[in-house]
Regions:
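Conserved acidic donor-binding segment of nucleotide-sugar-dependent glycosyltransferases
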Residues: 415, 419-427, 436-441
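Aromatic "clamp/platform" in nucleotide-sugar-dependent glycosyltransferases that forms part
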Residues: 383
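Short hydrophobic beta-strand element within catalytic cores of glycosyltransferases
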Residues: 400-403
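Non-catalytic membrane-proximal stalk/linker segments that position and tether the catalytic domains
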Residues: 20, 24-120, 479-494
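A short, active-site helix/loop in glycosyltransferases that binds the activated sugar's phosphate group
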Residues: 77-82, 215, 243-247, 251-284
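Glycosyltransferase donor-sugar binding loop
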Residues: 155-160, 332-346, 359-361
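Nucleotide-activated donor-binding/catalytic signature segment of Leloir-type glycosyltransferases, i.e.
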Residues: 172-176, 345-363
Length: 494
């Protein structure tokens, strides 16, 4: 390198070091226009110094498109630091949008069960765990499989489902929530929508799935346009910690019922409430009383032990159970059920302190509990409900029942079939009903007999199948979609 070149190199090195602090100082004293002129002069000087000071490689293609360079030049009149000098342009590199293969992988993982299997019916459910609604899912899926309907069950939550093994062997299961657990909610919705649109199934049944209800609300019209018949099951409203009504029927149904081909429930009372408060057409509504266990048998009862079998959660009012047990020290209360996290503190400790209460944890089969033969009756204390399956199982086992008049319970339990107390009954009223049931064995036996007759007549498998076939378009060989079947709207007899 010549002497002139070496001098220019030293000057360029000095300029690189001194330029930032000088520019910072000048920003405090110069106007924007003066500062802009200084930067332009420095850029020209830098180009002259570096021309011989460094070996410039052959120019490479510009990473930035020309229109961006032009905009930077225009913006430099306002902010001189944005001027697209050669040095500034060299720091830019090519950029490509990141590719997220997650949705594509989820879609590909579900293709076999949605497309290749070619199901006739798709069930969208949150999980299959121990519970009445989950048992209802099993009833619906079993009925479809029994009638030759090809079924795909889509589990939309990322949770363990211990009851998956109860599904018929020929049913396909997609654990959608677990497969897509790394995706965002919108990606999961869009992948599921694409699968449902491309799936040959004409019927879709939503049962308690948050993701499915969101999909119905946002894309129900699209699914309808593609010829999908969408059915949804609702059982009761929920109540939050402030006793405010919530749940799928409150949050989604008023905005999405128009996309449904049918609204199903296990009780008639709740459907009437929805019709009265939201104005949903009664011809859209269908109630199907769930069947009792196929292996139901009456089991002789003895003693004075009271069975309480429910999930220990705020809905089931374990605090009320505590007050009832406190008021009836002469009776033993055996409590079976998984403890909700909300009740693992003081509520659980209070129950353990009572000498006439025994906590046994969760159970898998009510019939297995009843076969022990040591229970005199079932106590049910739910705050809100549909038509609880446990009442059917207890009746099948020959147990008398004391329960509150909430949800659809009065459709099964009344003064002829059990001991019904008011929805707002306190511990004293429950205690009086329990004493009446256990203190009058002849009358109690008569009511149990009537309850079992009702169970046989209305809650058999054939009755469930016949009711499902009356839902327009739901099952092959049933009522055609163009035929109307209206829900009777007179009050339920109690």
């Amino acid at each position: 390198m010549s002497l002139n070149g070496r001098l220019k190199a030293r000057a360029a090195s000095f300029a690189r070091t001194a330029y930032p602090p000088i520019l910072g100082s000048l920003r405090r004293v110069l106007s924007e226009r003066q500062l802009q002129r200084f930067i332009l002069v420095c850029d020209r000087l830098k180009g002259w110094l570096l021309k011989e000071a460094v070996v410039v490689p052959s120019p490479s293609p510009m990473a930035l498109p020309p229109w961006i360079v032009d905009e930077m030049k225009a913006l430099a009149r306002i902010e001189p630091a944005l001027y697209p000098s050669a040095a500034k342009l060299r720091v830019f590199t090519s950029w490509k949008a990141p590719i997220d293969n997650g949705p594509a992988q989820l879609y590909r993982g579900c293709l076999a069960d949605f497309i290749e299997y070619a199901p006739d019916m798709v069930f969208l459910v949150p999980h299959l765990q121990r519970g009445g609604a989950d048992l209802g899912i099993l009833h619906h899926v079993r009925l479809c499989a029994e009638m030759g309907v090809k079924v795909t069950v889509v589990v939309t939550r990322d949770v363990v489902s211990p009851w998956l093994n109860r599904l018929p062997a020929e049913v396909r299961v997609v654990e959608f929530g677990r497969l897509g657990n790394l995706l965002g909610e919108e990606d999961r919705r869009l992948v599921l929508l694409r699968l449902l649109l491309q799936c040959p199934a004409r019927s879709i049944h939503i049962i308690n799935s948050q993701l499915a209800w969101e999909l119905l609300e946002r894309h129900g019209k699209t699914l309808m346009f593609e010829g999908k018949r969408i059915y949804a099951s609702v059982f009761c409203d929920d109540l939050d910690g402030n006793a405010i009504r919530c749940g799928y029927a409150s949050e989604f149904l008023p905005r999405s019922w128009m996309h449904l081909a049918g609204l199903l429930s296990d009780n008639r009372t709740f459907l009437q409430q929805i019709h009265e408060r939201d104005g949903i057409p009664p011809e859209l509504m269908h109630w199907l009383y769930f069947p009792a266990s196929d292996h139901a048998e009456a089991i002789p009862t003895a003693g004075s032990t009271i069975l309480w079998a429910s999930r220990i959660s705020p809905q089931k009012r374990p605090g009320l159970l505590y007050e009832i047990a406190l008021a009836l020290p002469e009776y033993l209360f055996e409590v079976h059920g998984e403890v909700d996290p909300a009740c693992r503190g003081e509520t659980q400790r209070k129950l353990r302190r009572l000498p006439n209460v025994r906590l046994h944890g969760r159970y898998d089969s009510f019939q297995a509990l009843a076969r022990q033969g040591r229970y005199a009756m079932l106590l049910y204390t739910s705050r809100y409900d549909g038509l609880p399956n446990i009442l059917l199982e207890a009746t099948a086992a020959g147990l008398p029942i004391v329960a509150p008049d909430v949800g659809g319970i009065a459709e099964f339990l009344n003064t002829e079939t059990g001991y019904l107390v008011g929805a707002d009954a306190d511990a004293g009223e429950f205690a009086r009903a329990i004493r009446s049931a256990l203190g009058n064995p002849v009358e109690t036996a008569r009511r149990v007999k009537r309850a079992r007759e009702l169970l046989t007549r209305r809650h058999g498998w054939a009755a469930f199948r016949d009711a499902a076939r009356k839902i327009p378009g739901y099952l092959p060989g049933g009522v055609r979609p163009e035929q109307e079947v209206s829900m009777e709207t007179e009050p339920v007899s109690r």
